[in-house]
Amino acid sequence: MSINVNISHREDFPLLRDSNIVYLDNAATSQKPDCVIEAVEEFYHKHNANPLRGFYELAMLATEQLENSRTTVKEFINAKFEEEVIFTKGTTESINLIANSYGMNFLGEGDEILISIMEHHCNILPWQFVASKTGAVLKYLECDMDGLISDTAIEEAITDKTKIVAITQLSNVLGRENPIARITKTAHEHGAIVVMDAAQSVVHVKIDVQALDVDFMAFSGHKIMSPMGIGILYGKKELLNKMPPFLRGGEMIESVTRTDAVFAQLPYKFEAGTDNASGAVGLMAAINYINSIGMEYMHERTLMLTKMCFDAICKIPHIHIIGAKDSNNHNGIISFTIDNVHPHDVSQILSESNVCVRAGHHCAQPLCDFLGFKSCTRASFMFYNTQEDIDTFIKSLSGIRKMMGYGD
Amino acid sequence: METSNFYNEILTEHNIRPYHKHDMPDATFSLNGVNPSCGDDITLKLKVVDDVIEDASFIGDGCAISQASADIMADMVIGRSKEEALRLAEMFIRMIKGSVTNEEIDELEEAGALKDISHMPARVKCAVLGWHTLQEIFEKNEDANT
């Protein structure tokens, strides 16, 4: 696919269109295109009622919007059944749901939970909790300094004691894609289930839950241009069916007596309370937008921008990129350190040129410890970034050490 | 507020070549101060004799603002009484919150170079880390016989 760097997609995004912001914090959250903002507005203008309740026209319209979104997501991730798609408020809630409903009920003393060293805290803390309550043991699958998880590491780490493997498809610090299909195969041979955190990958990799054969998958809408506060949990139907509800209350029941309740069928068993229907509608619009642009095109363009930036950074002295040496393994994420300049100072100086980057430990402290740094600066790209964005970033980046009083 | 003006020579000098960033084996007080959200981590050491700060130093790491601010503070409190040091701490924190007079900024000497932090809410914690740790040492040891 040939990508023309001069074609700009900024015009689709009001925040970018109407400003000179150089937005390079896409791994934290993406900007929202007009079509998503308009879809949310239209829901409140024309379809607002409590979905899944009420027998009047408006309530049925709201329900239809919510269910249309579910169908759109099902197709987007290639799930087998619509009821395998559960709306949550984001990746964090999705993983907490799995940990609380599956982990707390199907794990016991001596069972092992395997997570990778590059997990975001949202895929660490729920498992630390499950381990502490059930007596299960939390183990770590380690990568090399380039972020690669080898076949040998996978074979050695997954044993018959392993019950859950929870792993990110794409590290939010390294940008490296993990060999999920390989991990799933080995895990299943040992009778373990696989939970895939797709928060970071969903915008870069075409997710096919059936091809990957993952048992659970979670992502947040806001990283793929939908509103904040809407996310997805995918789970295989046979697993979801045997799990108890996570949250209890309205909308997740068939009937309730003074002492007991019969829970609703999937997916509603896991959607207690009023769904974020406007968020779901926004998510549907975002997926439609992605489909209209083309996932492959978006990714190719992101890789091209990543490479341009990667090559330019490599020419600046005293800057060290974290992870793979090949920019194609970075998937839009370049984390780096600058000798003797703290990432918060880097971020503040870049901010003067309207460049937005993330500084800190990126909610992945175990990875930072493992790779031997306390914090770093991260620039992350999406297809709507431009060559000008990179030029502005690199120009500002090049002057930082001098501004901080160093001679070079 | 332009950052290029903000990272002035006083700040960068104290960050790159701190005078008081070293251990102090005969310290009478030592306290760790941390900003968990951003990773600034210092341990402040004081040698206090008869309520007078005879020496002050710090170790640790963090952003330029946290390091320079701690170094400037150490410079300022050496030779002062506990009460004077606490008065400066209170004044410095007020400066960072944006409610201080020009006379007070003058009295804060080099620490006055950090006054523009009052326009940078994200960096307030970095600037006050050393001073907060100083306050905490004296609050925790109010009854200590020094």
PLM feature spans:
Chain B
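C-terminal binding/interaction regions
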Residues: 1-25, 82-146
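Secondary-structure capping and boundary motifs in well-ordered enzyme cores
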Residues: 38, 65, 119-123
